[in-house]
């Protein structure tokens, strides 16, 4: 039986929380930032939580977390 492997892309994107959820970063903050307002970029710095419906998929990709 082969070992269960962690999806490395998901491991870099999601961090588990104590209550069983996963933290995630906001998108749209890598490039083409000159046309985006300071307020918009500031709000994109904050972290978010993944949706409840995606929790099972992320948990399957991160079996050892």
From Swiss-Prot:
Pfam families, per the entry: Ribosomal_L35p
Any coiled-coil regions, as ranges: none
Cellular component, GO annotation: cytosolic large ribosomal subunit
PROSITE patterns according to UniProt: RIBOSOMAL_L35
Single GO MF annotation: structural constituent of ribosome
Composition bias type Basic residues, residue spans: 25-45
Region (Disordered): 1-46
Keyword terms, alphabetized: Ribonucleoprotein, Ribosomal protein
InterPro entries cross-referenced by the UniProt entry: Ribosomal_bL35, Ribosomal_bL35-like, Ribosomal_bL35_CS, Ribosomal_bL35_sf
SUPFAM superfamilies: L35p-like (SSF143034)
Domain of life, source organism: Bacteria
PANTHER family hit by this protein: 54S RIBOSOMAL PROTEIN BL35M (PTHR33343), LARGE RIBOSOMAL SUBUNIT PROTEIN BL35M (PTHR33343:SF1)
Family: Belongs to the bacterial ribosomal protein bL35 family.
Name of this protein: Large ribosomal subunit protein bL35
Higher taxonomy: Bacteria, Pseudomonadati, Pseudomonadota, Gammaproteobacteria, Chromatiales
Gene: rpmI
